[in-house]
Every structure is written in structure tokens, then in C-alpha cells.
Amino acid sequence: MSDQLQMTDGMHIIVEALKQNNIDTIYGVVGIPVTDMARHAQAEGIRYIGFRHEQSAGYAAAASGFLTQKPGICLTVSAPGFLNGLTALANATVNGFPMIMISGSSDRAIVDLQQGDYEELDQMNAAKPYAKAAFRVNQPQDLGIALARAIRVSVSGRPGGVYLDLPANVLAATMEKDEALTTIVKVENPSPALLPCPKSVTSAISLLAKAERPLIILGKGAAYSQADEQLREFIESAQIPFLPMSMAKGILEDTHPLSAAAARSFALANADVVMLVGARLNWLLAHGKKGWAADTQFIQLDIEPQEIDSNRPIAVPVVGDIASSMQGMLAELKQNTFTTPLVWRDILNIHKQQNAQKMHEKLSTDTQPLNYFNALSAVRDVLRENQDIYLVNEGANTLDNARNIIDMYKPRRRLDCGTWGVMGIGMGYAIGASVTSGSPVVAIEGDSAFGFSGMEIETICRYNLPVTIVIFNNGGIYRGDGVDLSGAGAPSPTDLLHHARYDKLMDAFRGVGYNVTTTDELRHALTTGIQSRKPTIINVVIDPAAGTESGHITKLNPKQVAGN
């Protein structure tokens, strides 16, 4: 009599496929039809981090992908849960972060005939415009190859978000266990090196060597590449001033003598040759137009050929992965050495010193209530002594001022709103950074921005994560002194509840809360929060009149011809 065959099902197969591909963490929100999948993943040793909203779970997965070069995994239920996570998936794609969103879905036979199934939605086709790729699995024997494809697509070339649709009937479908194991694919070399054209590398070095005022701009693609040592060696060998975009801060420490960040406007307006390293010439750099010299020549190092010539002609495109491209640039530099003219470095230093003095005056001015400058000065003092922390930052004025004031000393320690300038990333990124690294995280939040994902403080407390949330509370979106134009006593469109005590939220979840009104109180609370490794909220009372409309990008608001 033969032994009885051992059977398995789709949800066990997908979990085994995740394990065999070294996926160790899932971020998500459970419900029909994925609850048992999450339970089984946890039973198999995969960490499951449960959120209060799928969007934050997706942001956590994306942050994990950025920090590790492995796809972060987000798990959602069907239809509404899928749509909640879709914003995070799109944001990952736009920013170039590897992420896979796995969602349960309804019965295809009913959905395709629009017969009104539970949470009916054609999720795969809804995801396609916003993801790097989207796949649906219709039979359990395809789960292994589907996950393998999702992993490879998410990390190869320019990284991005991939959607994987798992209908409930596929999760429940059965297979003989030994046969199922043969269908699982372990991905080998998912992101192979893409070497640049040697002629392009030679041309790039030749153009830089002739430049009188060269500048290197480091983008988050450079940070993602983890080519930190090659970038440092190249910049220091050629003595080329560099300008980091916000999430590239710390590749070289912001206090490095070649950093041109404090003379950003002058550097952009006067550089004659600019080398973009994993940075896109998009709205964050005024598309290379306003504020730039008309005759600036560009070298662009990017993994995506379609990015070249997107806004300004690129004199020398160097297409390849950043690590390989920088290795080639270093080798060529050693064969054809040059040093940036001292006069260019000196004039940048003069402008840096002038701007630093102006900033010092703002930072050292004592006010009551606090403003962004003196409050961020206190934060900067504490973080200077805690350089291992991860910094998450979102808001308008809170983001823009913190980016300029707070120095970063190590790569990939700053996570912010990125290419889309999206609000709501704060708690998800903070949780993702904490879970991935095990290090303390400080989230510097505008009060409006915090509101997008504030309920995730329960998640932070439930997992006892070392996250300190600093909320700059001026009682409004941008500012808290808006005017009611209706005359009906209604709040202004930009006003929030004045005198809100966000620190009190921690009473509900057994975290720690501080309400601070002075820089000394802020320094003490932040130092204590970091050192204690306890979930902490610091409510920083800011002048309602502090800040400007839309922060540093007021000019993006359409101009009115008439009206209020």
C-alpha cells in the first residue's frame, strides 16, 4: 500500500518561495484572503510587521528596499486594501526603490463578468500604470516563477515597485507537496552589473579635466548604489566640489570641505561642467534651466538610458549601474589625473562662509514661541552627537529647513519625501528603517504631515521600536495663522487645531510623550528619547506665524488673476 501523498496549498507555496529567496520581513495589513498567509509566514520565521494602514506598510517596505537593495514586501487584502497600498507602490517606482506588493484578490471568473464579488476589482490592470510591472498568478504551480520574476524586475535596471496579484482560489488551491517544491525558483544574480561604455567613461574624464568650474551632483541613485568608497575616492582625488540631493546627504559627510551645499545656488549658476551621479535633472533641479548657466555641459551617470537628455542635452551619457560606472571613472582618473582649479574651490568657500554666517544668525536667535530655525538648531546639536541614527523627515517648512540645517554624516541615513514630495511617508519610513537596521530613528515631522500616518504610533509601540517622533506644531498646513475668508467663524483651509497636544497620544499606547516650548527642553527630550530607545513623541510648540506657504516651493502654486 503506497504512502498517502502530502499536500500543500498556494499560501504555503508562496511563503516557501519567499523564504528560499531570503525574504525575511513582510509589512502589511491582514484580512480576507491573506490572514492565514501572514500567520504561516510568521510560523516559518519570516517577521511580520502589522500596520494600521496599507499605505504606511507599503512605505515601510519601500524604505527597506532602498536601504538593503532587496525588494521590500508589502502584503494587502483585495480592492480597498490594494488601493491603499497602491500609492506606496507608485511612490517606490517613481523614486527607484525595489518593492513588491502582494495582494489577495477576488475570483477572476466573477470579477471579469462584473457580477459583484466581494471586493471586486481588476487589480492587476489597475496597478500597471503605477508599477514597474504587474503579474497575476492563476494556478499554484506558477507562484514560484511569478515571485522570481517580481524579484528580478524590482531590483534590476532602475529599481521599482512590482505588483503580484494572488486570487483567493490560488492561495487555497492544493498541490502535492514534493511537486510544489520543484516549482519554486531561487533567483540567481537578480541585479547583474551593467558596465558603462569605456569610450563614455574616457570622454567624461576628458570633459571634467578641461572644466574650470566642475561640480558633482549626487542623487539618491548614488546612495542606493552603495558605491560610497568609490564616490569618496573619486571626489577627493580630483578635488571636485559636490552637491548632495537630500537623500544623498551623508555619502560624504555634510561637513566635508568639498561640499558645496551651503553655496548651492551659486554653484549651480556658475558651474561649467556638471556630473550627475544617480540624480535626475527634474523639478528638484529646476529641470536644469532656471538658475543654471545656459552653456553648462552635463555628464550623466544613470542606469536608465531614457533618462538621458530628458531636460537638457547631455554632453556625455555614461549608462550603467552607478557602482560599475564609478569604478570605471576611478580607473580612468588614475590614468589621466587632474585636479579642480583652486580658484573655483576658493570662491565656493567664500560663498559658503557668507551663507553659513547668515544661517548662524537665524539659528542662534532666541524667540518665544520657537521658530523653525532655533528649534532645528537644538535638534542639530543633539543629532551631531548621535550620528548613527536614521533620520526621517517630512513636511513643507519642516522638511525644507531641516534639510538645510541638519548635517548627515553617514550614507543612507536620511529618508524623506523624495521625488514626488509626498506627505505621509513619515511613520512607514521610520518603521521600515528601524526594523531593517535595528538602530534608533528620529522622525522630524510637520504637524500636518504627521496626521497622514499618525495612527502608526500604535504600531511603533506594539513592536517597541526605538523611534522618536519630533512634531513641529505650528497649528497649520504651512502656517497656523490662516484667515477665515467666509466670515462664518470657520477654520482657514490651512489651519489645524491650535494648541494640539500630540504628545498625549502616547498615553494611549504606553509610549513616552514630551511637550516642549524651549530649546533646552527640546534638547533634553530628544537626547532622552534616543538614549532610552523607547517610542517617543516630542510636541514642539512653534509660532503659528512661522513658515511660508508651501515651504521653499511657493513658486509652484498657480498665480491667481483675481480673487482672494
Curated annotation (Swiss-Prot):
Cofactor(s) this protein requires: Mg(2+); thiamine diphosphate
Positions with a binding annotation for Mg(2+): D447, N474, G476
Record bears the keyword Metal-binding: yes
Entry binding sites for ADP: R158, K220, R280, D302, I322
Recorded superkingdom: Bacteria
Keyword list, A-Z: Decarboxylase, Lyase, Magnesium, Metal-binding, Nucleotide-binding, Thiamine pyrophosphate
GO terms assigned for molecular function: ADP binding; identical protein binding; magnesium ion binding; oxalyl-CoA decarboxylase activity; thiamine pyrophosphate binding
Family annotation (InterPro entries): DHS-like_NAD/FAD-binding_dom, HACL1-like, Oxalyl-CoA_decarboxylase, THDP-binding, Thiamin_PyroP_enz_cen_dom, Thiamin_PyroP_enz_TPP-bd_dom, TPP_enzyme_TPP-bd
General function of this protein: Involved in the catabolism of oxalate and in the adapatation to low pH via the induction of the oxalate-dependent acid tolerance response (ATR). Catalyzes the decarboxylation of oxalyl-CoA to yield carbon dioxide and formyl-CoA.
Protein name, entry field: Oxalyl-CoA decarboxylase
Species of origin: Escherichia coli (strain K12)
Gene that this polypeptide is encoded by: oxc
